[in-house]
Each structure stands twice: as C-alpha cells, then as structure tokens.
Amino acid sequence: MKKDQYIPHEVSTRTCSQVINLIETEGCAGYGIYWALLEYLRVQENYIGDLQALSSLKRQLKIRQSKLDKVLYGYGLFVCDGKTFYSPKLIEVMKPFEDRRARIDAYKRNKENAKSL
C-alpha cells in the first residue's frame, strides 16, 4: 500500500455532534461529501488543501458549489482561511499513524546502517 493511501475511519464518526448535524441536514450525500473532502486532504502535504483545487472534486462528485460550501463552512468540521482548509480531526487521527510510520522508518534505517558497518 502506498504511504498516502490509508485513512482511519473511526466507527464513532457518526456520533460526533457536528457530523450528526451534517447528516440530519444534508443527509448521506453530505456525509459522503465530508468523507470525499477528508480523502482529498489525506493526500495533500500536511493535510492542508487548496480551496481553488476543489472545483475538480466538485465536478467528480457532481455537486453544486453551494452544497460543497455548506459542508465546508456550515458544520465546524473544517478550518478555512480563504485560500486553504484542513480538518483538525483528520490531523488528530493521523498523528498515531504517522508516529508509528516514523518509528518503522527509523528502525529500517538503523537496520540498514548496521548492515553497512
């Protein structure tokens, strides 16, 4: 599996009050848009996305800008500064994964260094 192909999907995601509000208002379509945005952020450097780049995602999902904006700005799930956006929750859940990967990479480097001695 490529290094940027994994994203944890906690089964408790739907019990978060912000996500509950999203689903109650936007339905499963809104929930799907939320996860599509998380998937997009997952492959971005530092999990920070460019708002201008979302036009491609919008076309892929066949949604209107107004629907995308509701999910991005309406539920407190993303932090947007006008040019970029990120999900604090995604950063939080990826931290243990990144820490584990760093330990594995360090172990592999140490093992390779030991072989070269």
Question: Would you name each region that the model predicts?
Answer:
Residues 1-111:
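Detector for short helical micro-motifs
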